[in-house]
Amino acid sequence: MQVTFLGTSSGVPTRARNVSAVALRLPQRSELWLFDCGEGTQHQFLRSDLRLSQLRRVFITHMHGDHVFGLPGLLASLGLSGSSAGVDLYGPDPLDAYLHGVLRTSSTRIGYPLAVHPVRGAAESGRIVFEDDDLQVRATPLHHRVPAYAYRVDQKPRAGRFDVAKARDLNIPPGPVYAALKRGETVTLDDGRRIDGHALCGPPRRGASVVYCTDTVFCEAAVELARGADLLIHESTFSHAEAEMAFQRQHSTSTMAAQTAAEAGVSQLVLTHLSPRYAPGNAVTANDLLAEAQAIFPATVLAKDFLSIDVTPQTDPSCCNSS
């Protein structure tokens, strides 16, 4: 999996940072998932190497404008391209009314299947939000001024590595049968032998996991959702010195994000959703917030627009390669 940040500012865009949007690229299935869609997100797509035509799912954390104002336009542009097989959207209860209200009043026609799935019930009861053969998505309620949800994406365990040398020693002819054996299936060869694929594969390999957590003040629910994740993307709207304001506005400080990462035992933390007050040249900058977080959780990096991170299933804090 690969994460690309398309917007890392909170509230309003700046010259260097657009408002919230994070893309999750799934190259093994040529799909793209999007988490939040602030105003201008489709412009960020144009400036990146991401293909909007691959967009398949959108997960919205909450209904504040800096997380949703870009959604109607992006979906409309996708419709004009004529290349979408359909998009599923997940988010708070008002998402459906908001989206279809904008599309209706602007006489915008979406020429592809569009389905909206409220996540409140699943998030509050611990049920799965989405699942297929390869991936699972869960959500949990956060502590914010409006209903908000964090999301976790888990790759399911993959079959162990296939021992080609052992297969050759058993005189198993290469070809389609290898694919079945790699999946752990039992196959019958032309000579009548039955071969159990599990006997030719190593132990199952753990899949990667990504958690997207915004907007919220520190809460235990976020810790539980993020437990053991390879990558935690967490809002860091304020510095530690502004903790009182963070509590009032139900946002996180850099140290709250780091505390969540430390308690959850994640491999790497990325700070995002940064207040414009920390722009370069100000008394306190985003690099100061990074230093505050690293004092608690050293494996922390600072998000910037178009930063890409390859997420691999490891416990080593250096597991995630960024570019």
Swiss-Prot record:
Pfam families: Lactamase_B_2. Its cofactor is Zn(2+). Binds 2 Zn(2+) ions. Its EC number is 3.1.26.11. Zn(2+) 2 binds at residues 66-67, 215, 273. The active site is at 66 (proton acceptor). Gene3D superfamilies: Ribonuclease Z/Hydroxyacylglutathione hydrolase-like. It is an enzyme of class 3 (hydrolase). It catalyses: Endonucleolytic cleavage of RNA, removing extra 3' nucleotides from tRNA precursor, generating 3' termini of tRNAs. A 3'-hydroxy group is left at the tRNA terminus and a 5'-phosphoryl group is left at the trailer molecule. It comes from the Bacteria. Zinc phosphodiesterase, which displays some tRNA 3'-processing endonuclease activity. Probably involved in tRNA maturation, by removing a 3'-trailer from precursor tRNA. Homodimer. Belongs to the RNase Z family. This is Ribonuclease Z. It comes from Synechococcus sp. (strain WH7803). The lineage of its organism: Bacteria, Bacillati, Cyanobacteriota, Cyanophyceae, Synechococcales.
